[in-house]
């Protein structure tokens, strides 16, 4: 008799996706991040749902409702700490997942990659509107600064900014709609993640060598389910260590003060996972130019398949490209550091150099390295 999981219409989909899925035999721990991201999303939706039961999206009560959750709700402090630090874990996994895709040439699965970039943008939007909800000083001023960037769009910019605000500044209407967006977006992310998987399963997973692995596949279960379980346990361990021992380490002290439109914090900065893009935005001394650079810093991922010049897919056997990749990684860490510093010398010039290097590496140096490696691999006799 054929197993129910192979015949039942619903179980059949799960079976083809997570049980009998043929997977390359050599995929490393870098391929764990997909399942870790799925887990992060589930944690965020669950903790977020329980937080939403006690939160009020009104400028007068939002801040005190968050304090109420932490003081009076059973394990409310834990829910809040898991949700806030879960976002940090989510972005850590996202950045590592994207980095893996760049290193091993996974972007050549164009549909999967493009959906992935859309997912990244959607998660960033969700995190931004979510950061506004506690209605602390940094929440309010972060929302003011970032939504103000819309006003740089010629002709319709100011109208668009006021339309998003629901008034002439960030206020009650803005907070209410941001809560609505923050509630709906994770479900859109879930749907997009399913589409992401759908396109991935059309081609099958890439692998570290970048060579077609069809001749050597193994079933996903039990081999990769057990491997993913180890990754999930480590993720849980790090998240719990963060949420229980230093829950405010990655937050901003200014957010412990209620929002005050009459008092601007000395350094307005977003959460750590946006700092690299914020540094690129600030490094251009022109508002519109900065916004375009900010958009380009993420949108550049969409053209990576067009910039691939190497004959080999993966960087595993391409030392020049590897070197440039790790320089790019160091550059992004530098940008993250600069984004959290005040706008003064020497941080301004370091940020500008790091921003130029970021685009130079992706648009010029890495494609040239691919061509050079092709030339070096050609027989010379």
UniProtKB/Swiss-Prot annotation:
Heme b b562 binds at residues 83, 182. GO terms for biological process: mitochondrial electron transport, ubiquinol to cytochrome c. It is a multi-pass membrane protein. One of its GO terms (cellular component) is respiratory chain complex III. SUPFAM superfamilies: a domain/subunit of cytochrome bc1 complex (Ubiquinol-cytochrome c reductase), Transmembrane di-heme cytochromes. The chain crosses the membrane at residues 33-53, 77-98, 113-133, 178-198, 226-246, 288-308, 320-340, 347-367. GO terms for molecular function: metal ion binding; ubiquinol-cytochrome-c reductase activity. A ubiquinone binds at residue 201. It is found in: Mitochondrion inner membrane. Heme b b566 binds at residues 97, 196. The cytochrome bc1 complex contains 11 subunits: 3 respiratory subunits (MT-CYB, CYC1 and UQCRFS1), 2 core proteins (UQCRC1 and UQCRC2) and 6 low-molecular weight proteins (UQCRH/QCR6, UQCRB/QCR7, UQCRQ/QCR8, UQCR10/QCR9, UQCR11/QCR10 and a cleavage product of UQCRFS1). This cytochrome bc1 complex then forms a dimer. Belongs to the cytochrome b family. Heme 1 (or BL or b562) is low-potential and absorbs at about 562 nm, and heme 2 (or BH or b566) is high-potential and absorbs at about 566 nm. PANTHER family: CYTOCHROME B. Component of the ubiquinol-cytochrome c reductase complex (complex III or cytochrome b-c1 complex) that is part of the mitochondrial respiratory chain. The b-c1 complex mediates electron transfer from ubiquinol to cytochrome c. Contributes to the generation of a proton gradient across the mitochondrial membrane that is then used for ATP synthesis. This is Cytochrome b. It comes from Myoictis wallacei (Wallace's three-striped dasyure).
């Amino acid at each position: 008799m054929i197993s129910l999981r192979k015949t039942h219409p619903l179980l059949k989909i799960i079976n083809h996706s997570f049980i009998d899925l043929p997977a390359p035999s050599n995929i490393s721990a870098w391929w764990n991040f997909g399942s870790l991201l799925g887990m992060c999303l589930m944690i965020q939706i669950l903790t977020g749902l329980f937080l939403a039961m006690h939160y009020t999206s009104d400028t007068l009560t939002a801040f005190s409702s968050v304090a109420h959750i932490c003081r009076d709700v059973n394990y409310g402090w834990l829910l809040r700490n898991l949700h806030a630090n879960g976002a940090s874990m989510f972005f850590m996994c996202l950045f590592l997942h994207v980095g893996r895709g760049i290193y091993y040439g996974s972007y050549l699965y164009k549909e999967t990659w493009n959906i992935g970039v859309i997912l990244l943008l959607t998660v960033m939007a969700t995190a931004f509107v979510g950061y506004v909800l506690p209605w602390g000083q940094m929440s309010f001023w972060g929302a003011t600064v970032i939504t103000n960037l819309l006003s740089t769009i010629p002709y319709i910019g100011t109208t668009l900014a006021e339309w998003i605000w629901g008034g002439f500044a960030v206020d009650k209407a803005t907070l209410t709609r941001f809560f609505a967006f923050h509630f709906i977006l994770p479900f859109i992310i879930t749907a997009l993640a399913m589409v992401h998987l759908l396109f991935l399963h059309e081609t099958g997973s890439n692998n570290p060598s970048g060579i077609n692995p069809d001749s050597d596949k193994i079933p996903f279960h039990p081999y990769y389910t057990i491997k993913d379980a180890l990754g999930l346990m480590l993720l849980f361990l790090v998240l719990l260590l963060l949420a229980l021992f230093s829950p405010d380490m990655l937050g901003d002290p200014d957010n412990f003060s209620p929002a005050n439109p009459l008092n601007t914090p000395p350094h307005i900065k977003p959460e750590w996972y946006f700092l690299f893009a914020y540094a690129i935005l600030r490094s251009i001394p022109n508002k519109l130019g900065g916004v375009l650079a900010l958009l380009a810093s993420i949108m550049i991922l969409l053209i990576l398949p067009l910039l691939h010049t190497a004959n080999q897919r993966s960087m595993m056997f391409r030392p020049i490209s590897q070197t440039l990749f790790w320089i790019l990684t160091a550059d992004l860490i530098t940008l993250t550091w600069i984004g959290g510093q005040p706008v003064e010398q020497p941080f301004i010039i370091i940020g500008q150099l790091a921003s130029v290097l970021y685009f130079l590496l992706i648009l010029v140096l890495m494609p040239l390295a691919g061509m050079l490696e092709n030339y070096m691999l050609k027989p010379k006799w």
